[in-house]
Structure formats: structure tokens, C-alpha cells
Amino acid sequence: MYRLKPFGVLDGREVPLIELFNDKCAVELLPYGAAVRAIRVPDRTGKLTDICLGYDELESYRTLDACFGGTIGRCANRIGGARFTIDGRSYRVTANEGENCLHGGIEGFHKKLWEFTCEENAVTFSYTSPDGEEGFPGAVRVEVTYRLIDNQLTIAYKAAAEQSTVVNLTNHTYFNLGGHSSGTVEDHVLTLRTSRYTPMDSGNIPVGTLAPVEGTPLDFRTPAAFGSRLHDKAFNGGRGYDHNYALDGGEGPVAELWCPATGIGLEMTTSMEGMQLYTAGWLTERKGKDGAVYGQAHGVCLETQHFPNAVNCPAFPSPILRKGETLQQWTAFRFFAR
């Protein structure tokens, strides 16, 4: 089922909050950014708990950074040097993180007001990115469908381009399975079905190779809590995780995240080959929902994606979408408590 509630006004247009709900859980969505605002699931005692970071007002989504819950595009993650070449033609896109392009530029998809349609258990958001937006070639039509069935939220992406361009879509929900206002995620236990990651240079740009996670702090093949690694100066300068994994593929979940305090967990499956693990190391203190105060390491993002900077790395799977092709990909989260 679904229902709409008032949330804000942007450029004279009403921006509603859209809630999908059933007898097991509920998800709140916003047309601004095609974003997830809240996910409420039962903890081990049956108490409904909101497990993702968000804001109480539209203005915060519009003006603040961090991309809370947003759909990221046209190209998620980083493009080194904010430039690339397709079919011999060079393009320069918006540099908004030093000399690099991050999450589609200054006004990425998470900063757009999307159209939407609702059905019984799903919402489909649509947006057409014009030719030249943030420097990217060709117009692209994008649809993102959120579907809630029982205790599973599936996010399905669809895109078509009018000329060859880069398309890499993801969702930037910050999960805190202790409850969105519960503080750091140091106690969260992560399991990943992946044996390799993409090494980066000093600017967080993948260098185009894969390396084994074995023997590094990136190895979560057996369940492990984040613990002190989220603040350890010897690991990523004390910023925690902001690393892309090359998923092993195959059937079944590629990630499990669990909070021992509440018993809430999630299993993630996806059609994508990569996943950025981000533990909010750059999240500055800010006011969130219900008077909560968020800060560094208060959330975990599991951003399924093409590899960062893949358009400049021939050995990586290509993120180029060509005219006549249709991009279709999906990620699903199954919530549980134990």
C-alpha cells in the first residue's frame, strides 16, 4: 500500500512524501532526488525502528551535502580528472571534488525533482537528463522503481541514451541498524562475498587494477565489526571506509550488515559488479530527523555500482551506455531481526 503526505514546496511545486508500507515494514520516499528518507523495520523485540539517516525538511536535502538516500547519477562515484573519451571524442565534465567529478557533478541526479507514479507496492521515479548536463554527452531518460514486498525493498534502474555516454547509477542511503539517531556504527558486523577491491591513488581514484582483500582491513569475508578502524589514523587517515569492492558474483547475497544492539540486519543482492563501502568518514555534524544529531561514522552506505573511474580504465567493465541500448540493473535489501 502507499500514501502521500505533504513535505515541502520547490519552485512552486508541491513535493510530497510517499510512503510504501505493509504489515512488516515501511519506506518513505521523496521525488526530490528520488530519495529514500526513512526505512522502518522491527527490531528483535518487534519495535519498529527507523534505520536510515535523513532530514525533516526539504531545504536540507536541497542545500546540504552527503546525498542522504538519493539516487546518484549520471555517473556515481568518481571520474578522475573530470574527463574521459568515448569513440575518440574527449569530454570534460564538472569537477566538484578537487580536479575530479564526484556523483555526477554539482547538480547530480540527487539534486533533481523527479516525476513519479505510484502503484500498490511500488513507486517509479523518472527524470530526463538533457544533453550537456554537467558536461555529459547526450540526453538520458532514467527510471528508478522502489518496490516493497514483505520485508524486502528492491531498487530497479532503467536508462536509455540518445548518444553514447557514461551512466552509472546507485543509491546513497546511510544505514544505521541501531536506529538513525543511535550514534556511530562501530558495533555493526559486516560480511562481504568479495575477495578483491580496486586500489586507489592519493585522490581516491582507482588505478585500473584489482587487488586481493586478504591480509588487509578490507577483508570482510568472515563477519567482522567495524570497531576502531572507523577512526584509526593508520587506516585511510581516520576516515574509515570509502572503498570499492569487485563483487564475486553468483547467486545469493553479496553483503550482510547486522547490529547486535537491536538485532536488525539486512542482506543485499544485486546485479552490479561493484560496491562502494562508505562509513560516513566525511559526514560533518548536522541536524537530522526528529532532532537527531548526525556526525562522522554514523552510517553505512552500500553503493552498488560500476567501478569508479571505469570509463578511464580499459580493464574494468564499461559504464558506457550506447544509443539503442537499455540499461537495466537492480539491488535488493532483505531486512531481518535475530
Enumerate the predicted regions with their spans.
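An exposed, glycine/acidic-rich loop-and-rim segment of catalytic or binding clefts
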Residues: M1-R338
